[in-house]
């Protein structure tokens, strides 16, 4: 992680988490960070991978719309990818689980 401002990267994550939770507070679902940002093995160019589960397809698309462009609104220089884990391949879910996740919302 050479030449990465860890405090700045942490502030991006915290601002993103706070806003994601604010925008989804009325929905019942599970939201978690996964991938390199969750494991701490990120690079300066790494995106934020958010997984959502325990949610209907309709509500998932509602969440995607609520979060569309959030990185620009929060002035975060990284993209945010949102994955519906209820419809993801089992092997992908298994691999993510092995790598570890950072749970942001339980329900």
Where are these regions (language model features)?
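Catalytic core of pol beta-like nucleotidyltransferases
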Residues: 1-30, 38-44, 53-107
């Amino acid at each position: 992680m050479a030449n990465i401002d860890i405090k700045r990267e942490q502030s991006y994550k915290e601002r993103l988490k706070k806003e994601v939770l604010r925008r989804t507070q009325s929905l019942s679902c599970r939201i978690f960070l996964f991938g390199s940002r969750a494991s701490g093995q990120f690079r300066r160019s790494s995106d934020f991978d958010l997984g959502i589960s325990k949610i209907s397809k309709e509500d998932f698309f509602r969440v995607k719309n609520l979060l569309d462009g959030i990185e620009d609104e929060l002035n975060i220089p990284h993209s945010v990818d949102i994955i519906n884990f209820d419809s993801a391949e089992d092997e992908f879910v298994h691999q993510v689980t092995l790598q570890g996740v950072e749970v942001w919302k339980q329900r």
